[in-house]
Every structure is written in C-alpha cells, then in structure tokens.
Amino acid sequence: MKKGLLIILGISASITLSAQVPKIAGVKKVDLTNSNAKSTDGESRNFYNTATSNQRNAGPNAIQTAGVKFTSSWNAFGLLVSSSHCLTADQALNAVMFTHRISQDWPADANVASGYGEYSWSTNYGTTWDSSYFADQTSLGNKRFRYPSGAIINPAGNTNVANALNVATGPYTSGTNWDGYFGNYQMMVNGAGSSTSIFDNGVGTPALAFPRISITSYDDSSAWVSGGFYTDPIAATGYLGSNLMKGKWDGTALTWSFDSILPNFHQDATGANDSWTQSFVGFSPNGQIGYQVFFGVDGSATTSQTRAFSPITYKSTNGGATWNLLPVNDFSTIPAISTYLIPASDGNLKPWFDQSQGADIVVDNNGELHIVCTISSGYSDDNDSLGYTYTLTGQNGTTAQHYIYDVHTSPTGWDAWLIDSLMTTTSTNNTIFVDGSTGGAFATDARIQMSHTTDRSKLFFAWVDSDPLALAGENALPDLKAVGFDLVTGFKTPVTQFTTSQDFYFHYVSNVTLVSGNTYSIGVTNSIDRNGSHDVITTFDHYFYEGCKFNTSDFTVQFVGVNEQAANFGSLNIYPNPAKDQINLNVNMVSGENVSFQITNSLGQVVLVENRSLVNGNNNVQLNTSKLTSGVYFVTIASETSKVTSKIVIQ
C-alpha cells in the first residue's frame, strides 16, 4: 500500500489549518448521477462451490491498520454510498449492527450465494459478533440483492436483543438491469420470521429505484428510507424526485408503504433536472417531525443567489402523512457561508450544496433539521450552467479544498456552523483502488457522515482527510477525524484526528452514538480488499474501530451560532468565574421579557432553575451556587424569543 509523507498532527488534538486565498484552476460541471455507485455487479455464484479455502478463511494479504476484522463481503459495491446507513446502534440494547453483502466466510451452506445480505451485530461494542443472513437469493427467483442498508426496530422499553427487529432495504438486479427492490425484516437474534418483500418495477409498484439512503428507525416502531423516483427505474435514468419507503412494525408483522415527492426542479436545455439524484429523509425520535431534503435548483427561485444547488426541503409534523415545502432561502446571507464563497461570473455569491464528499441529515432534540455537507461556489447563473462550480488548486497542499458545514433550521430561520475544512480533494489519479468491472480507477472521497445521541442533544460529524502535502493533495491516504456538538450547552469538542495509519478506507459511521456515563462512543467501520489487489470487485474485509470516542470534558469550545437565538439579549456578563457561593449575571435586554435561568452539570442534568421577569435595559441577577459541587457547569438563559448559554466553573 502506498504511503506518502506523514504529518502527525496529534491524536485527540485540535487541528487548525489556515486557509489561504484559493487559486482558481477553472470550472467544472459536477457529476450529479452518482454513477460510480450503480454497478449492477451481475455476477451470481455459490461461493462455497467456487472459492478456495484461502479465498475464504486464510489471512488476508491486505490488512486494515485501524480496527478489528469482524466480517467480510463478496465485494466492495455495498460500501460505495456513504449516505447509506449501513452501520447503526441501539442504546437500550447496547448493540451495534452492520448491514452488508453476505460474508465470504459464512459457514458452508449449499444455498448461500453472493446475492444474499447479512446482518452482523455486537452487544459488547465489537468484542464478539453474531450474524444472520437475509434476502434468500435462491428461493426468491435468483434475484441478486445489492446495496443493503439497515436499521434496528426496538419496541419501547425492551432491552433484550431477542425481542428486537432487523430491517433492511435495497435494489435488486437480474445482472443487466435494475428490475426492482426489496424490503426485509426478521428477529434480531436468530433471524426468526424472516420476510423479504419483492417489488418488481412496472408491476403495480411505484417507479422507485435504489432505496438505500438515510434508513433509520424511530420510537414509533417505524423505519424510513429514501429512494429515487425515475422515469425509467430499470435503467435508473430520468430522476424526478424521491420515493419514500416506510416499514411499520405492529408487533407481529412489518408492513411497507410508499410516498413520493417530486419537486419543481429547474431544468436545463436538455430537459434534465438540475438536482442531485439522491435525497435524504429523517424524523424526530418519536417519528412525528420529519424532513425530506433534496440538493438542487428550485424552479421557483428568481435571483442569482437562490438559483443555485441548495436544500429543497419538505417538512412533516404528522409522521409523514403530509409534507409541506419550505420557502426558497438565500443561503448567501448567512455569514458563516458567504465568508468563503467566490463570486460567480455575474458577481453574485451562489452557495452550491455538494454531495460529492458525502452528506447526511439529522433532526435534533428540538425538532430542527441539520444538514451536513460541503458547500462550494457556483460559477454561473446561465440556465444551462447552474451545475458548474469553481475548480480550486491547492497551494502546495495548504489550501482548504472544501468547507464542511452544518446547515440547520432554527426558530428564526436558517443558519449554519462551519464544522471544518478538508485539505484534500477526491482521490482520482492517486487512488489505490481499481474497478475490475470497468478497468478504471475507483475514486475515494471524504465520506462525511453524522451521528447522534439517542435524545439528539449531541451531534457528531466524522470524515476522512489525508496529508495535503502528499499525492497531489488528493484524499488517497485517509485518516479519521471527528468533532462533537452539544446542542444543550452550546459547546463543541476540538476537531480530533483518531488515526494516523493513512488507510482508513470505505468507512461507515454509526448514525447512533452509544453513551456510557461521560463517554460517547461512535461506532465506525472501515474496509479493505482481502487479496491485496485493491480491486473493488474482490472480497472486502470489514474492521470495527472502537476508538472514536469523546468525553463530556471534551466539550470545551463555545461554537459560533450558539447565540443565534439571543437576539433580545443585548449583552451578558457573568462574574466571578470561577465562582463559589454565588454568580452574578448582568443581562442587558433589548425589551422586557420573562426569562428562565437554568444551570446544568457536565452530564446535562439540571441542578438549578429560576424564573425572573426582566425589564428593558440592564438587569442584575444573583444565583445561589453554594450547594453545587466543584466542577464545570453551563448557565442557559432563555426567553420566548431568545436563548444563550455560557460556561462557568464552580470551585
């Protein structure tokens, strides 16, 4: 495996890279089709009749440095889409689960073939694993099931994996076309009651293809996944919008239902929609407040700034029964975004929301939507050139190539936080991977993903980046990075680099973070080919990396945007800090309001609450802290219109 110059920036250390003025190398039309992730992989074989013992069970030639090997897949095609939730977790079960193409190491079974799927799970955070297969290719008409992703439906109050349900969806192929899709469910421990529903395109089913984005389960025993609505779903061409697939468990059976959303996309001169060909769906924990997000140009946008690839967002407040389109928004008015944009050819700023480095969404503890992705600069307002962005060249590897954002809704409108910047771009010329089915190189990107605690009060963002001084600034030597945001306290962790091995390939991040005391464990997998050829059509081994963890004490940086709801608080001063028996708060109010003062400890537990009626102008408030033990606390001051949080230390 090739290694370049290694710059060790430090494990568990904040990484700050200064972005210089970017050099513009030109413009490009972005590939919106995700075409490299639609290989039909027409092969179908019983690998116990064809594979040698060495292919199945011997020590691999290519070994992943970070993590412990726990399973494998027939090839890498099930790993290609980072927005598929292939890795998930459940707090009540203390379980992590990986959904994938069936393992090359499955015990000898005359029926098992390469088109099967597999659930692999652990209840001790990767120490031991169990698994069961699903989507029986042989008994279901030799359909080749592809791109599986999955979720755990766990009934309320249950802590026994025997009573939990696995659920998965994906497309299937005959080897030439995409002929339909499937939905599977079965009991978690032993695969009991396994049921796979087959939906053939053109036979009384929606024009759906590739139900593989955002699959997540919710407290109402439902699971949602987003697929595409196509004029020709068999060829996966003519993208029109989304087709949502919902599975609902009633305690004895799971029923699938469908809905579609077809936005009014702007069209270019060829009649093609200006949009990415995958969308995202997510709900609040109770399954009631939901969002469907497309990246594209809204046909009703009228200004240069809004005629850009932006979130086209639909919201539901009744569990997906109905959806309402949010108004067109000008994201160039958000300073965190506009600061790093390059003016388009007409002089306007055109924020261009990009999926090429990965993207994800989460609905937080307040029912607000969070979108993570990179944002580029749109180049033109010409009707046929809205899909063009600037191409930047790194200045000896020192220029940030892509800026990562959390763009979110709030009670006062849209806002954004700058998460970090990528110092490398997609690896195309220097990737180690090849696609034997096409004979070409296989590119690798940052695979940006999001994880959240069960209550959605903490969000974690993870991606890979490489040494910017090696291999022409391409992301060919990836290491894992992550950062956490506490939405209650308004503090985040430093961006932390967790690995230095430069080989963290094809990673998946669990969409659910497991919490134990003060520790937040984010499950991550990474994968490498077994035989050392780096061909994505060969067997890939999967490794579980358990080292991506944060502690409550890591949330030390107050992040930009915490004062986004603080419009009525003209100023705030808290003293002394550190304090002992009392803290004094000087609050300057723009207008009089009833205000709540709340102190929480480092575990998020409320230890003091007082309500006061404050007047316009300066207000002095004293809070008795004499009964608080020594440590770090957070003071949240909230009114009906404003909210602000500050950190204090009690001695």
Residue ranges, per PLM feature:
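Repetitive helical segments and hydrophobic/amphipathic motifs
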Residues: 11-12
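Extracellular, repeat-based ectodomains that mediate carbohydrate processing or recognition
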Residues: 20-559
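Short, intrinsically disordered low-complexity segments
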Residues: 1-2, 22, 100, 611
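C-terminal outer-membrane/trafficking sorting elements
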Residues: 3-6, 15-18, 564-651
